[in-house]
Amino acid sequence: DLMLQPQDLGYPAPLGKNLWHIGSDEMLKYAEMILQKQHPLLQHVQQPMFVYVLTMKEHGPYHTDTPNHFNLVKDGLSQKTIACLNDYTQRIVALNQATETFHHSLKQRNTPYVFAYFGDHQVAFDNCLPPKLGQYANPDYVTQVVVRSNVPSSFTQQQTFVDLAFVGGLLLEIAGLPVEDEFMRANIAMRILSEGKLEDAEDQSLVNDYRHYL
């Protein structure tokens, strides 16, 4: 395993610099550099690489003076909240553009890839928490998971809901890679048994047994 900071790949800042404002397009540019092994510690790597990238630009706080670019109107929302929502939305638009550009670069490499991305947690605008939909155990942490790949696979999605704790096994299956340890075998089996749920599973005794087994 190897942990690289953006500064290790050319970002002009000291290692102790706060990176909350680094753009997601920049972060994905550094991910491309890692895949191209543009770092001395990567040049000997021959096996497939698993690269995890954390983007930060989408995180709050959000600016309360952002113009209403998206013409948002809703009863009960203050002007500050609408401004924050516009700021958040424009950051998500930029993230989407960066994501599509990165995915295009993956396709151009003509090598097998599995590209997955997911959100972190629900947002608060001007200290206003939007109402949550659905009966979830932790509604503030409901997000989306997207997987895109050029690897031929017989994998079919069985669950309409999946806990992020099961994404590792999901990616192994989609990539067609062998599951070589008991932890990941249990991870995949539990995802199937619990229909992708963990905290939200109806059978919490099964969840407790799974955790005890791990």
What are these regions (language model features)?
Residues 1-214:
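Solvent-exposed soluble domains appended to multi-pass membrane proteins
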